[in-house]
Swiss-Prot record:
Further information: In the reaction, the free carboxyl group of octanoic acid is attached via an amide linkage to the epsilon-amino group of a specific lysine residue of lipoyl domains of lipoate-dependent enzymes.
Reactions catalysed, as given in the entry: octanoyl-[ACP] + L-lysyl-[protein] = N(6)-octanoyl-L-lysyl-[protein] + holo-[ACP] + H(+)
Sequence ranges assigned to domain BPL/LPL catalytic in this UniProt record: 79-267
Protein name as annotated: Octanoyltransferase LIP2p, chloroplastic
Annotated site, Lowers pKa of active site Cys, chain positions: K186
Native source organism of the sequence: Arabidopsis thaliana (Mouse-ear cress)
Metabolic or biological pathway, per its Swiss-Prot or TrEMBL entry: Protein modification; protein lipoylation via endogenous pathway; protein N(6)-(lipoyl)lysine from octanoyl-[acyl-carrier-protein]: step 1/2
Known function: Catalyzes the transfer of endogenously produced octanoic acid from octanoyl-acyl-carrier-protein onto the lipoyl domains of lipoate-dependent enzymes. Lipoyl-ACP can also act as a substrate although octanoyl-ACP is likely to be the physiological substrate. Together with LIP1P is essential for de novo plastidial protein lipoylation during seed development. Acts redundantly with LIP2P2.
Length: 278
């Protein structure tokens, strides 16, 4: 199986961290609701919406980095650049962050069940696969908040709002751990990288994901907690069974809505012009 070393000398992404009381008590910046009395114009965000496609991880990774470089070039020229968000699913793959070691793999890396990529994002090892919605915001934090902890909390907040507003599922953060949890189950993993205040990598939300491949790793380096998905939570609750494809559609719509509101962005759908992406 392919092992790719992709560590770059950029600003480190953050995955696990310990929060001080001040950080823990700090509220996520409130969202401004645009209405007739609010004349602030939201910034444009180019959206490559491939949520119903399986995109190979290596292609999406290279794509992100090329967009980051384009934005950095514009910034160096003192030109404005729109934010970007990519939404997709991946073919089955394991990715390792900057904190990862092979101790968290329950298999010989030379005989891995899927490709394994060592990346420059923060955090440990995780799995991506069909039924998991992956969101890669590539945004200029100079236009938002130049604070990586704030950015991580905002990504968590987006998922928490999706679960609450769409399914009335109460999700939460856990002190000292990055991600989103429902009870003892982690439903969303987050790992980022930032270069000159341009973000990439992002969040992965388990919707209908087959959870079996998580058994072959120690997800995010956490041994004493489970991984869950929205489908399982709904089956355990009062909502009952929901068709897999319909569930993906519903979560996708909610995810984009909450993302645009949280970061005050106007989503503009784009067409993927590079046939090599798919």
């Amino acid at each position: 199986m392919e092992l790719l070393n992709g560590v770059e000398t950029l600003v480190s992404g953050i995955h696990h961290h310990h929060r001080t009381n001040a950080k823990r008590n700090r509220l996520v910046r409130s969202v401004k609701i645009l209405n007739s009395g609010n004349h602030e114009i939201p910034r444009k965000c180019l959206c490559f919406d491939l949520y119903d496609k399986l995109v190979p991880y290596k292609k999406a990774w290279s794509w992100q980095k090329s967009i980051v470089e384009e934005k950095k070039t514009l910034i160096d020229r003192n030109q404005d650049c729109a934010d970007t968000v990519i939404l997709l699913q991946h073919s089955p793959v394991y990715t390792m962050g900057t904190a990862s070691t092979e101790d968290y793999l329950n298999f010989d890396i030379k005989d891995a069940p899927f490709n394994v990529y060592r990346t420059e994002r923060g955090g440990e090892v995780t799995y991506h696969g069909p039924g998991q919605l992956v969101m890669y915001p590539i945004i200029n934090l100079r236009n938002h908040e130049m604070d990586l902890h704030w950015y991580l909390r905002m990504l968590e907040e987006i998922v928490i709002r999706v679960l609450s507003s769409t399914f009335s599922i109460k999700a939460s953060r856990l002190d000292g751990l990055t991600g989103v949890w429902v009870g003892n189950q982690k439903v969303a993993a987050i790992g980022i990288r930032v270069s000159k205040w341009i973000t990439y990598h992002g969040l992965a939300l388990n919707v209908t994901t087959d959870l079996t491949p998580f058994n072959w790793i120690v997800p995010c380096g956490i041994r004493d907690r489970k991984v869950g998905n929205i489908k399982g939570l709904l089956e355990d609750g009062e909502h009952g069974m929901v068709d897999d494809l319909r569930l993906i559609d519903i979560v996708h719509e909610s995810l984009l809505k909450e993302f645009s509101e949280a970061f005050q962005l106007q989503i503009e759908k784009q067409t993927v012009s590079d046939p090599n992406i798919l």
